């Protein structure tokens, strides 16, 4: 093979490798807003490996993942021979997610809740984009305003105008309808959502409590989260990018590691192609390894 042609192939492969490396981080960041870990919890009651409940729980989690491909909320009950063997569970995606993003989020939540809650009968996991919960104790359709997570930022630099805008946004959330509510005013963004097993009136009551607690407990904080067992309300003062940074949320499944593995595999493929082209050049010269002395990448 002519050396000029070989060099052109190598240059093309190098450009391709660079484009993959340049675009992969942006593709990863597109999902980070839904995949970030918020909180998780497990029940104290355990089940035995290979038990009837474990089988029912696996069926339940599979149903959650499958259902998330076409619905943003659903709940299931997998009946057992006894109440303690019956698995109950639900998932809830954030109201502004597309179906593919919802399905991806729920699948990742399910993959993480097992290691988080090994052999526990109950578990719950909240990612930024979705929520899953399961237990062998009945909880579906029951309003629960227990505070699960409260997080408030600092009040430094938050002026009276900012507080007024924050209060206006939270009032808008209280007065809004539906199970998912979002709004903003200037640099203040707010969001609230109920789990879909609540009635409309229960949702309104739950969100009203969450927002009231958010205003009282976080005061003049630049951001605030109030997660109750069946609803949440949150606000930030300068949009989603600051929101993620100021909360210091981290994913639990190593997106950076996955990216590094992909880049490593691509590099190996490029090197293999270069090596095969090199061998072909050697063979075409009848085994003349003098090509080694003139071989230059670029």
Curated annotation (Swiss-Prot):
Keywords: Cell junction, Cell membrane, Disulfide bond, Host-virus interaction, Membrane, Repeat, Signal, Transmembrane, Transmembrane helix, Transport. InterPro entries: Cell2Cell_Antifungal (IPR051378), GNK2 (IPR002902), GNK2_sf (IPR038408). Residues 259-279 are annotated as: Necessary and sufficient for plasmodesmal targeting. It is found in: Cell membrane; Cell junction, Plasmodesma. Residues 31-258 are extracellular. GO terms for cellular component: plasma membrane; plasmodesma. It is a single-pass type I membrane protein. It comes from the Eukaryota. Its main location: membrane. The chain crosses the membrane at residues 259-279. Residues 35-139, 140-240 form the Gnk2-homologous domain. Residues 1-30 form the signal peptide. Disulfide bonds join 42-117, 93-102, 105-130, 152-218, 194-203, 206-231. Highly expressed in lateral root and elongation zone. Gene3D superfamilies: Gnk2 domain, C-X8-C-X2-C motif. Residues 280-298 are cytoplasmic. Belongs to the cysteine-rich repeat secretory protein family. Plasmodesmata-located proteins (PDLD) subfamily. (Microbial infection) Interacts with Grapevine fanleaf virus (GFLV) 2B-MP. Modulates cell-to-cell trafficking. This is Plasmodesmata-located protein 7.
């Amino acid at each position: 093979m002519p050396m000029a042609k070989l060099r052109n192939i190598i240059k093309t492969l190098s450009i391709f490798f660079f484009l993959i490396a340049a675009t992969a981080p942006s593709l990863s960041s597109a999902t980070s807003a839904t995949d970030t870990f918020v909180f998780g919890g497990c029940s104290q009651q355990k089940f035995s490996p290979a038990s009837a409940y474990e089988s029912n729980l696996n069926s339940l989690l599979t149903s959650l993942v499958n259902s998330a491909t076409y619905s943003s909320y659903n709940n299931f009950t997998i009946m057992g021979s006894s109440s303690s063997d019956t698995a109950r569970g639900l998932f809830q995606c954030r109201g502004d997610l597309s179906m593919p993003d919802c399905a991806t989020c729920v699948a990742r939540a399910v993959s993480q809740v097992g290691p988080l809650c090994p052999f526990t009968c109950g578990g719950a996991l909240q990612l930024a984009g979705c929520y899953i919960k399961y237990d062998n104790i009945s909880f579906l359709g029951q309003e629960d305003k227990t505070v699960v997570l409260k997080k408030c930022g600092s009040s430094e630099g938050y002026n009276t105008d900012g507080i007024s805008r924050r209060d206006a946004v939270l009032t808008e959330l209280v007065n809004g309808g539906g199970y998912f509510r979002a709004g903003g005013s200037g640099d203040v963004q707010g969001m609230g959502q109920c789990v879909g097993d609540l009635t409309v009136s229960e949702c309104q009551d739950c969100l009203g409590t969450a927002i009231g607690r958010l205003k009282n407990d976080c005061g003049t904080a630049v951001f605030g989260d109030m997660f109750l067992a069946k609803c949440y309300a949150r606000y930030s003062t300068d949009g989603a990018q600051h929101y993620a940074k100021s909360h210091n949320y981290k994913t639990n499944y190593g997106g950076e590691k996955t990216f590094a593995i992909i880049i490593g595999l691509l590099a190996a493929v490029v090197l293999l192609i270069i090596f095969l082209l090199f061998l072909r050049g050697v063979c075409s010269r009848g085994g003349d390894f003098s090509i080694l002395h003139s071989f230059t990448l670029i």
